UniProtKB/Swiss-Prot annotation:
Species for this entry: Chloroherpeton thalassium (strain ATCC 35110 / GB-78)
Residues making up the signal peptide according to the UniProt record: none
Entry binding sites for 1-deoxy-D-xylulose 5-phosphate: 123, 149-150, 174, 197, 210, 215-216, 219
Keywords: Isoprene biosynthesis, Manganese, Metal-binding, NADP, Oxidoreductase
Protein name (database record): 1-deoxy-D-xylulose 5-phosphate reductoisomerase
Pathway where this protein functions: Isoprenoid biosynthesis; isopentenyl diphosphate biosynthesis via DXP pathway; isopentenyl diphosphate from 1-deoxy-D-xylulose 5-phosphate: step 1/6
Reaction catalysed by this enzyme: 2-C-methyl-D-erythritol 4-phosphate + NADP(+) = 1-deoxy-D-xylulose 5-phosphate + NADPH + H(+)
Gene expressing this chain: dxr
Length: 387
């Protein structure tokens, strides 16, 4: 029985993870669950899956959670310390990191320090702290298994292959809802437009990231750390059908690709069962209904966030942390309709240009840079409105 902690159990990855766990009650159990502020769903999950403990990140909601779980023999914690505590406890074997954004960094660090294997869906953790995280994986002998569909695809294509035979990896991107829009129309993009993803059902932050193609940019940086490749060996192609999840090109010119219906339960299950594969009755590809698979070069003039991510990755150091913090704030402001869609990339670019490039050798350094960048972007956005 593999005992599983889910950091972010009420989000898209978390709810899909619980669905996978429910299909294999003899193999998996949910030991600890956490949520940001969705206290009602967390309580429902706790009553259904009977974990040992739950964490609500929003400390002001702890009282409500206690009321909802009154009479239940479930430990209740709150805040970042609660999240870190369930990440390192000895009575869990595997941690699924699906907390959105920078908030996922510290609990992932705690899980790795405690020698836990991690299924990583929180790409920001590697974007911000790639060098620190990969060092911890090596130091503590942990496995870090990708849960993102694209990185899971690359991981699967690399099974049985020697690293020296890899030429490059090719991450596929749906292109989002604005793939066919002219740049001149981008000024008119509304929040509702941007949340209307053509292929995947995801949380609001990652859906906006997909619309700007920042999601793919973050995945490029994540791939650099997961697969130890330079940026000139990480390509992105737009694939509107989201059937080919990613590819690996080898030195002899041959290419391996991993295909499947766009269903996050499949890569989640693979991370949980690796190196085995369990039967599951998920939807299968119907080859009779696939008339063609399209591939395009991404337009980085329209989608500047992808180019900014490559720039931050190549500069290295603390630039990816700045990229991530600026993006998180810009997306938050866009979702609140305080800035326009085009302002997202503008604010990220401004923050990167303003950054002094100082090194970040510890988690505390990264926290300081993250906080400074967030203040800068909030101030810059306020100045936009003042004009």
């Amino acid at each position: 029985m593999k005992r599983i902690t889910i950091l972010g159990s009420t989000g898209s990855i978390g709810t899909n993870s619980l669905e996978v766990i429910s299909r294999f009650p003899e193999q998996f159990c949910a030991t600890y669950l956490s949520a940001g502020s969705n206290v009602k769903l967390l309580a429902e999950q706790a009553k259904r899956f009977r974990p040992k403990g739950v964490v609500i990140m929003n400390e002001s909601l702890e009282g409500e959670l206690r009321s909802l779980l009154a009479g239940e023999s479930i430990e209740i914690m709150s805040g970042e310390e609660g999240l870190c505590e369930i990440s390192r406890r000895s009575d869990t074997d595997f941690v699924i990191g699906s907390v959105v954004g920078f908030a996922g960094l510290k609990p992932t660090v705690e899980a790795l320090k405690a020698g836990k294997d991690v299924g990583l869906a929180n790409k920001e953790t590697l974007v911000v702290g790639g060098e620190i995280i990969t060092s911890l994986v090596e130091e503590h002998g942990c496995k870090m298994l990708p849960v993102d569909s694209e990185h899971s695809a690359i991981f699967q294509c690399l099974v049985g292959e020697a690293p020296e035979f890899v030429g490059k990896i090719i991450l596929t991107a749906s292109g989002g809802p604005f793939r066919t829009w002219e740049k001149s129309r981008f000024e008119q993009i509304t929040v509702a437009d941007a949340l209307n993803h053509p292929n995947w059902k995801m949380g609001s932050k990652i859906t906006i990231d997909s619309a700007t193609m920042m999601n793919k940019g973050l995945e490029v940086i994540e791939a650099k750390w997961l697969f130890n490749l330079d940026y000139d060996r990480i390509d992105v192609v737009v694939h509107p059908q989201s059937i080919v999840h990613s590819m690996v090109e080898f030195k002899d010119g041959s290419v391996k690709a991993q295909l499947g219906v766009p269903d996050m339960k499949i890569p989640i299950q693979y991370a949980l069962t690796y190196p085995e594969r369990f039967y599951a009755d998920y939807e299968r590809l119907d080859w009779r209904n696939i008339s063609k698979l399209d591939f395009e070069t991404p337009d980085t003039e329209k989608f500047r966030c992808l180019a900014l991510a490559y720039e931050a990755g190549r500069k290295g150091g603390s630039y990816p942390a700045v990229l991530n913090a600026a993006n998180e704030v810009a997306v938050e402001l866009f979702l609140k309709e305080k800035i326009s869609f085009l302002n997202i990339s503008e604010l990220i670019d401004d923050a990167m240009q303003a950054h002094d490039g100082r090194a970040a050798s510890s988690i505390d350094d990264l926290i300081d840079i993250d906080a400074q960048t967030r203040r800068y972007v909030y101030d810059k956005a306020d100045a936009m409105h003042a004009v």
